Amino acid sequence: MEAVIKVISSACKTYCGKTSPSKKEIGAMLSLLQKEGLLMSPSDLYSPGSWDPITAALSQRAMVLGKSGELKTWGLVLGALKAAREEQVTSEQAKFWLGLGGGRVSPPGPECIEKPATERRIDKGEEVGETTAQRDAKMAPEKMATPKTVGTSCYQCGTATGCNCATASAPPPPYVGSGLYPSLAGVGEQQGQGGDTPWGAEQPRAEPGHAGLAPGPALTDWARIREELASTGPPVVAM
């Protein structure tokens, strides 16, 4: 009990300051709790599961007997234990206050347990294997596309079933209908309506006042122009 009293007194001085209870008051409280059957041993005081039953029992005793000395001492001790627990003090003495047992370090969680060297090597090998597999997956060529077919035949080889073509060319584009381009079929007919004039020959000009044909643009007679230029001679330049 003396060791427990010393630890609790140190905790109260740290977190309670001048209002810290004395070692005598702490010892009297522990003796009462053991007498009432609330503690099997003084070290049970470090367990948070025993705090609420102790608080309830001392509160009832204070109301019945009018003695609140032990309840006041317990309130200070409880405040110190909770403060140490909330702040998660890492010293060995603080761990003893928190009910982690005799100054021993609490067993770490599964994520904090250091694995043996053999397991670490195995885990490292698995990580390396996963990394290699991911790299190979990125470098591997894409899966060959299934040949495209129309109905049951392949575009490339025309096989109905069991096509072995790795890839097949896309189907040819549909034939562009005649509606997208102007038709030239009527051009020859229009040229031949005036008679048997061959294609490319000069069309007869419409006579003025002719009722049957619409007037068209006059064609330049380059042969006549050349004859006139030859007969007139070169122009005389005035000095």
From Swiss-Prot:
Pfam families for the chain: Retro_M
Keyword Metal-binding attached: no
InterPro entries in alphabetical order: Gag_M, Matrix_HIV/RSV_N, Retrovr_matrix
Region (Disordered): 124-144, 184-214
Motif (PPXY motif): 172-175
Keywords recorded for this protein, A-Z: Host-virus interaction, Viral budding, Viral budding via the host ESCRT complexes, Viral matrix protein, Viral release from host cell, Virion
Protein name: Gag polyprotein
Taxonomic source organism: Avian endogenous virus EV-1
